[in-house]
Structures are given as C-alpha cells and as structure tokens.
A protein has these predicted regions:
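Alpha-helical cap/lid subdomain in secreted, periplasmic
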Residues: 2-3, 31-47, 65-335
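Catalytic nucleophile-elbow at a beta strand-turn-alpha helix junction centered on a G-D-S/GDSL motif
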Residues: 4-23, 27, 31, 57-61
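Short histidine/acidic/glycine/proline-rich micro-motifs that form metal-
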Residues: 14-17, 55-59, 185-187, 217-219
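A short beta-strand-loop structural module common to alpha/beta enzyme folds
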Residues: 44-62
Length: 335
C-alpha cells in the first residue's frame, strides 16, 4: 500500500468556491472545484487520497505565495507581545489591488523595488496557529481589515519578535502536488513577470510537482506588463509567457473553457433542461471567451470569475486529466 496522495489547492475565492455548497471544503459530493476533484478521484478508484481546499476569499497573490511557502514572509518591524494581550500586525489598505499598511512582508523584490505587504483574510485550518521563532500564536481579523496575534500557549511572559522574523502558517507545506490558482484580486498593481516568478518559486516547495491554473477570464489584461494593443494580442502574450514558464504544468482555463467547457459539463449530466438552441448560444459565447451566466455562481452575470457547480466541474475534470498526464497518480492513490 502506497502512502496517501496529498493535493493542496491553494488560491483565493475561486478556489474556495464562493457561495458554493461546502465552500472552503473538499468533501465528497460538494461543489467547489477541490471537492469535485476529490469526488472524481474517489469515483475513479483513487482511494488513498486527500485534497485540501486552501482557498481564501479576498486574498491577493502575495498571501497565496506566502501560504504555499514559496517565498518567506517576515515581520517588518520589532514587535513586543504582552502577556495575555493581542498586538496588531497592521490594517490593510488597498489601491488598485495593491496591499499596504501591514507589518508582514513577502521576502521578494523585483525591479520595481516595491515592498510586498501580506494580509491574511481567513483564519481557518490552514492559517492558525502561526509560528514565529518557535512560539505559536493565534492570528485573527479584527476591526477594519486588521490582522492581530496573541500567544497560543501563554507562559505569562512578554515576547519580543525581532524584525525579520519568519512567520509560518499552519497548512501542510509538503504536499505531493500543489495546485495554484490566483491573481484575480491583484488588479493594475500586478505584473505577469511577478506572477511567473513567484509561481516558479512555489513550484519548487514540494520538489516540483504542481499545476498552475490560468484565469477563466481576462484578468491579465489589467496587469501592467502584458503586451499587446488588443485583447487578443494580450491573451496570446500571456499564454506564451505562461507556457514558457510552466510548460505542461499550466492549464489555460481561458482556452479550455472556450474549446471544451460545455462538452465536459454536458457529459457529466449538467444542462439537461437547457434547449439545444440555448446550448448553441452558450457555445458561441465560450468561443468568444465570454463565460455564459449558466457557468457563473449566481446564474445571472456573464464573465464573472466565480463559477457555478457546473463551471467548477469543468475545472476539476481538467485538473484530473492533467494529474494523470503528468504522472502524478497511480491506482492506489499514491505518487
């Protein structure tokens, strides 16, 4: 019997599964893409498998990278944590997707010279307890976008945290496979270069077994360094850079939904009550890279990054296929 295969799905609300049945979870039969991936694996005989939904709604790529552990997160200034009291890690401010105002920094610098602040939006099983210099703390969100910490096990002593101390979150840092899906919250402050460099660092955390999911819509049009005068030119540039950076580890959801999304959903039994004419309209929209409302969580808006159960099923199938093609699966569920 091989060891259990552990898959971490790390990202923001599109991984969490906004307003989905069993959101922020990966239980059998639930609706988020990690849960549907787990269901597909179990239904295909992969019994010895664990899929973790590490999606945090509202987080930017800095936080996703931090939680994976691809780049260290450090305390930016010396902190004194009093006995039995909380201390602030700063209040998050945002401008065009950029986070400022926190006392947590990603240890990464590109040619921009910007300091990359970190702010965790959720304090669930993959965040708490955080560990700094061997001491465990509980982190929380209080007031207006303020991260605070207090000692988990009090010894009735004041604690000094020197500037530059590394913070570890509680998630499993050495899964067999990391599936990375993010970037929808970063806006104009983000760049494709930063996305690829940070993701490549995350890819090495567990020895290089990873999958990168591209966005289902054109969020990359907002990133500062994506070249092209038209939307199509920008997409081709984004796709080329991602394929060059990640090779066959990259799943281009923008393209896959256009070519295969509807057929995958129909094959799984979805859209039985939709007419052939309505399906033709959906297919035409997908070919033009428009996400139909039937694939969106509220069934109303088009092109929303937050998908419905049907949309997340498509992602789960594509990930399952790629796990097999990359040789990450065997029938016993191990690696």
């Amino acid at each position: 019997m091989s060891e259990k295969l552990v898959i971490n799905c790390v990202g923001d609300s599109v991984t969490e599964g906004m307003e989905m049945r069993g959101h922020h979870a990966s239980g059998y039969g639930e609706a988020s893409y990690p849960a549907q991936l787990y269901t597909i694996l179990k239904d295909n005989g992969y019994e010895n498998v664990e899929v973790n939904n590490y999606g945090h709604g509202g987080e930017c790529y800095n936080e996703i990278v931090s939680r994976i552990g691809g780049v260290a997160t450090v305390i930016s200034e010396s902190l004194t944590v009093p006995d039995n009291a909380k201390i602030s890690l700063g209040v998050r401010k945002r401008d065009k997707g950029k986070t400022t105002g926190t006392k947590l920094r990603l240890c990464y610098e590109d040619e921009s010279g910007e300091e990359l602040c970190v702010y965790y939006t959720q304090m669930s099983h993959d965040t708490n307890p955080v560990t700094i210099n061997g001491t465990q703390y509980i982190m929380s969100v209080e007031n207006d976008n303020e991260n605070v910490i207090h000692k988990m096990y009090t010894d009735h002593k004041e604690t000094i945290i020197p500037a530059g101390s590394v913070l570890f979150t509680a998630n499993k840092r050495n899964p067999d496979v990391n599936i990375i899906f993010g970037g929808v919250n970063d806006g104009e402050s983000f760049t494709l270069k930063r996305f690829t460099e940070l993701t490549q660092k995350c890819a090495q955390v567990n020895g290089g077994k990873y999958i990168v999911l591209g966005s289902t819509n054109a969020v990359f049009n907002d990133w500062g360094d994506v070249k092209g005068d038209t939307a199509e030119e920008k997409y081709k540039y984004y796709r080329k850079i991602c394929l060059d950076s990640f090779g066959i580890h990259f799943i281009d959801l923008y393209d896959e939904f256009s070519k295969r999304g509807l057929d995958i959903a129909i094959s799984a039994g979805y859209f039985k009550n939709i007419t052939d004419e309505e399906k033709s309209v959906m297919r035409e929209k997908l070919l033009r890279h428009i996400m139909p409302s039937e694939f969106v969580y509220d069934k109303k808006s088009e092109n929303n990054v937050h998908l419905s159960e049907e949309g997340y099923h498509v992602i789960a199938v594509l990930v399952f296929e790629r796990l097999k093609l990359l040789g990450y699966l065997n029938q016993e569920g191990g690696v």
